[in-house]
Each structure stands twice: as C-alpha cells, then as structure tokens.
Amino acid sequence: MATLLILNQQPYDGTDVTWNALRLAKQLHSDGVEVRIFLMNDSVDLARDGITPPEGVEDMVAMTKDLIAQGVPVKVCGTCQQRCGVLKGQGYYDGAQYSTMAECSAWVQSSDKVLTF
C-alpha cells in the first residue's frame, strides 16, 4: 500500500502543517508503509539548503533529508523551482528528485492514499 503526501506550504510559515506532514511521513515509513513525498508551491524550500529554521523550531530540511536517507522518495516540482519559495531559482540538493506534473499525476494514480498538506 503506497501513501503519497503532497506538500504545498512553506516550511516555516508559523504553522505546524509542514512539520506534521513530515512527522506523519516518518511514522508511516516506520510502520512499514510505502511513503512518497511530492513537494510543490512554497514547500519546495524543503529540498534546498540554505533555509535556517527559526529558533526553537525543528529543522525540517534535515527531517526531509533523513527521510530520503531512509529510502523515502522525494520529488520536487520543477516549475516551482523558479516560481516558489524563499530561495526562488536555487537548485535542489542531492536526493531530492527534480520532477514534473506528469510524474505527480502518475504517483497520484498509483497510490492507494493521497494526503495533501
């Protein structure tokens, strides 16, 4: 059973939405669920080095890298690279896969569950 998490929000926007999505991804993976993450809109900053978390806030870029290191595939909207996030135009770090809407569509179609954050 595959679960796709689509993230949209900026990592450090004053809410816990993105943080909770990453926590859920970690727990699902730990529970043996096949987890996939697709980053679009301002959430693409999770795939970029250079974002410093505010004091007292967990480093969500590090959380994303840890998920990748554990084998969770993370694909990142290519169009959003130029248009979205605090670091517009900055490339993505190794392990975060540059992707397309067609690949997002394929993941949606082949996933048992799709959750959006």
What is each residue range found by the language model?
Residues C84-F117:
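C-terminal structural segments of small proteins and small subunits
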Residues V17-S30, I37:
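Histidine-anchored nucleotide/phosphate-binding helix
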Residues A2, S30-R36, P73:
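Residues at the starts of beta-strands that form the adenosine-phosphate
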Residues P53-Q81:
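A glycine-rich helix N-cap at a beta->alpha junction
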Residues V44-A47, R83-C84:
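Short, active-site-adjacent cap segments at secondary-structure transitions
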Residues G50-E55, G91-D94:
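Short glycine-enriched, charge-decorated loop/helix-capping segments at active-site entrances
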Residues T3-W19, A47-T52:
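Short, glycine-rich nucleotide/cofactor-binding loops
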Residues A25, V35-M40, V74-G78:
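Short internal beta-strands
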